[in-house]
Amino acid sequence: MIFTEKYMNHRSKEAETMNKKKKLDQNTIQTAKRLLKYMTGTHKIQFIIVFICIFISSAASIAVSLSLKFLLDDFIIPLIGQTDPNFAELYKALAVLGCIFALGVIATFIYTRMMVYIGQGVLKSVRDDMFEHMQTLPIRYFDQNTNGSVMSLYTNDTDTLRQMISQAIPQALMALFTIVVTFISMLLLSPLLTILAVVIIFIMLKVTSKIGSNSGKYFIRQQVSLADVTGFVEERMNGQRVVKVFNHEDKSKEEFDKLNEALFKSSANANKYGNMMGPVIGNIGNLQFVLTAVLGGLLSVTGVGGITLGVMASYLQFTKSFTQPFMQVAQQFNAIVMALAGAERIFRLIDEKPEEDEGYVELVNARKDANGNITECKERTGMWAWKHPHSADGSVTYTELTGDVRFEDVTFGYNPDKVILKDISLFAKPGQKLAFVGSTGAGKTTITNLINRFYDIQEGKIRYDGINITKIKKDDLRRSLGIVLQDTHLFTGTIKENIRYGKLDATDEEVYEAARLAHADQFIKMLPKGYDTMLSGDGEELSQGQRQLLSIARAAVANPPVLILDEATSSIDTRTESIVQKGMDNLMKGRTVFVIAHRLSTIRNSDAIIVLDHGKIIERGDHEDLIKLKGTYYQLYTGKLELS
């Protein structure tokens, strides 16, 4: 009974392994087909030319080998022993042979050059598709995948593709042609000797198939491990100051060693099997050569099969030519498997489900006439409206954007089994400043993520000017919001370009005005090139406060109806904060503003302050009301409690 259970478990594991292998093989085939579409899609004509050139090159190589028979049997041997040999016909044959050889060289030159062009073109198309699709992915994808693992797709994986397309594929095609044409030639020269070749081929394919399956498995692991190492290094480089401050160099080295050890093991195993392929095929090829020479010699001596000296010379040359393509494929096998593993990871990103958007309400420039009727305008008027198309009768109605935001019994969790916000109901009337207070993890930033629809709620509704935000197109929704995040991100470019990122068509004067409003104008003018100062590396040349000021200016130039300030002044020193606060007060006039701040002094003038605790609203009111209440906010403000 125990033996039966063990046997059944063993059979079950075997079946599971076979199913995984079958699925892996199917994925590899599908990946190869998709790569082929990239190569033949936009480069179809070039690929056909490459195909023809490879055929010519392969045929020329075979012709040179086949010519040995005719040179020996028809030209050289008949001349032996002649007192006055005539070499004219031999010279003609050699001239023809030289032309064929030259044609093969030219064809090889053409297809190698064209494959480089095709390879770079395919990589460009793959990178374009990757980046274009990446832009459509939801924030959740980037929260779940490290920057390093994504960057690895653009660097390591695309580089393996380049090597395969420009080197491995041409050699594989060349090998395929050579094998087919050589086999036919061998069959025509001596069917008896070719039977031996078929047996050797069977053995060779059986051995290489076994080695290849093991190698492919480990090459896939190698690419995953390489992405892990790349991601870890990228994270530690970005956080090097934190590592040094907390003296975590040894801990980081220990963690890196573990990842590097995993990469070493997968790479060692992959290359162990991959590098085994060449010597194995080479030795089998040598065995075939020896057996062919022995058998061919016996047949030649006995006169069986009509084997002459010329036939033997050509056949032995074909024997070398026959195993040579297998050697070439073996040499490129590692590159092909690595590239297919990398391509599979790339296509996994491209196949990621894009951010869904079922909205149909659009944000448009508008104008209101004397009767209060709203009409759509192409030019900027300073007034915005929501455009509602009605599919039933084809009519369109407009709702003025005022900035009224309401949460109605909202429940949300980043994971369904872990709720972050529970039955949240709140409102911000047009022009109100709403502040959120609470410890880390209370749900403050989550609320702003939901307003942007970076994530969608599980229960309840969020309304914007009375419209359920799920009905508003995400691009239009986000265009109506200005955001200043706690972690400031600047792009490589001038200061002017970084501010203009908030509104790409902003004039220089609008950029300068936004900078003045954010009180960034003063420090910008003190820089050597002012607004044309070039920033790089996320603006490392600037202080944290200066970077924050630019972020605020970027939001100001967008001139949005609603502002979200996620701890916008938490990284600024007290002196700079007072300067920025004046500018922010001007910026916030007439807008609906959501503020998250640890410094409670910055939100005293808020119309409403909401205190959150573990995803629930425990207090709401203005500063004076909450101080009188003497609850959590009072304790935080007076220092009896501290925000964690």
Give the residues covered by each predicted segment.
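Membrane-integrated ABC transporters
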Residues: 1-61, 76-96, 111-115, 119, ...
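Alpha-helical membrane-protein architecture signal
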Residues: 29-36, 45-52, 127, 147-154, ...
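An intracellular "coupling" helix at the cytosolic face of ABC transporter transmembrane type-1 domains
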Residues: 41-44, 139-140, 158-165, 169, ...
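Transmembrane helices of ABC transporter permease
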Residues: 42, 46-59, 96, 103-108, ...
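Alpha-helical segments in transporter systems
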Residues: 45-70, 93, 97, 112-116, ...
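Helix-loop-helix
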Residues: 78, 185-199, 269, 273-344, ...
